[in-house]
Amino acid sequence: AKRIVLKLINNRDELVKPMASTLAQVYKNVTRCNSCGSLKSNLKGCVNCENLKEKYTKICVVEDIADQWSIENSNIFQGYFHILGGTISSVGQRKEDLLIDSLVERVNRDNIEEVILATSATVEGQTTAYYIQDSLKNTNTKVTKLAQGLPVGGEIESLDDGTLFSAFKNRSNLNSNSD
């Protein structure tokens, strides 16, 4: 951070003025889409809603756009994204502040077959996932949640109790002749 500040100070005309102009344009022209929660340009529309040429049957629900980008970069999911804009918390964020109602609308409107809840393994993330599951109970949509447990390359001795508990609870059967 110090190096960045020094670089900006030493190259004020070259870097700071164009950066300030760009930030002002972003502030003026980029907002949050009311339907999916992604970034929306006043000039081009929503990246998620406008550019979808495929007809998907799944929606992956994430807390913020950084979560969407991580999942997209993994190339593991093909479908729509829905960005909540946070999680339900006991201090601050309320369920009304999140885009849960628009998720239910999208599920009904777009004939979504599965909603994948990709919220954090925190108390707030799990509370939010439970609330979404409850909000979708009157639809015919399958609601799933990402598995939790041991991270790839993780050492057992360095894991916290919650991760170990989740790993034991969500363990897989390795016998091929049974479920």
For each predicted feature, which ranges?
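Short, solvent-exposed polar/charged micro-motifs at secondary-structure junctions
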Residues: N48, Q93, G154-I156
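Long C-terminal interaction/binding lobes of large macromolecular proteins
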Residues: N11, F77-Q78, V104-D179
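Sequence-level detector for tyrosine residue identity
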Residues: Y27, Y56, Y80, Y130-Y131
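Conserved phosphate/pyrophosphate-binding and hydrolysis machinery centered on Walker-type P-loop NTPases
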Residues: D13, V26, L39-N42, Q93, ...
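Residues at structural and domain junctions
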Residues: I9, M19-T22, T57, S89, ...
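Extended interfacial segments that mediate partner engagement and assembly in macromolecular machines
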Residues: N51-T119
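Solvent-exposed alpha-helical segments within well-ordered globular domains of core cellular machineries
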Residues: K2-L6, K17, S21, N34, ...
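Cys/His-rich Zn2+-binding cysteine-cluster or related metal-binding knuckle/ribbon modules and their
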Residues: K2-Q68, N173
